[in-house]
Amino acid sequence: MAYCPFQFSPLAIFVLEELFVDDLLLQLNNISVVYSDVIQVLKGVSLAVEKNHIVSLLGSNGAGKTTTLKAISGLLKPENGRVTDGTILYRNGEIQNRAPETITRQGIIQVLEGRQPFKYLTIEENLRVGTATRWGNPYREDLEKVYHYFPALEKRKKGLAGYCSGGELQMLVMGRALMAHPELLLLDEPSLGLAPLVVREIFRIVRRINEEEGTTIILVEQNARMALQIAHYGYVMENGKIVMEGKAEALRENPDVREFYLGMSAAGTAKSYTDVKSYRRRKRWL
């Protein structure tokens, strides 16, 4: 056992532990998720999210990223899924398998992949839907805040959401989430199918929301390069397990992450898609 020159009193240890816990907003402790009592998707996933941080969750298709978000937000039940083992702690209270409306009222809001608006409502009407969990509260100020981050929405606020472009739809669903005053925002593949210029703008806004609103964000994203540029911390998932974690800057420099998710060789040169073999990734980590 290594010698430690410092000795702490029990009171000091308690205070240090409390300070550390107070910095954590969310903890997943060894959770497993099963669909239809048959298909196990998550196998002992543990992660921690500090307040006011952006945490990126990386991994290939089918790794379990979206299921992790749905376990947090309570959206497993509509898909006949449930957390069978482990605990999910939010503000130090257990929330696993709670009703999604209860979790939403606690301040956890998920922006689902796919950008599904109410097509026959206007953009502004769609945004007002985001206030459904806080009836009686004024919303005009919140609309102004959303338009501050997404000025393109204000220009078209009376137009039907069904006529929005992909980028406008992504802004709309993120704006609708902001209307609910999230403490923890779960973003699932915000860059999916968008042009590179739009992707850069979306990620710039995500960073601003984190910095200016103090919103804690978990970001599930295939675009690992962009995700790790704005994240504070990251986790890599493979086959329902966490196989790697670390500060974002450390993950950007990790040889495995560079090869399998950033498409870079050890020498720093770009690799073609055919050179990045998924079986090599699985063999190395599993």
Explain the meaning of each model-derived region.
Residues 179-183:
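A short, proline-enriched helix->beta-strand linker immediately N-terminal to the Walker B motif
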Residues 200-214:
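Helical segment within the ABC ATPase nucleotide-binding domain
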Residues 77, 82-84, 91-115, 140-143, ...:
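ABC ATPase NBD coupling module
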Residues 58-60:
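The feature captures the beta-strand-to-loop junction immediately N-terminal to the Walker
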Residues 73:
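Helix-to-loop junction immediately C-terminal to a conserved catalytic motif
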Residues 263-286:
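ABC ATPase nucleotide-binding domains
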Residues 121, 163-164, 177-178:
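ABC ATPase signature
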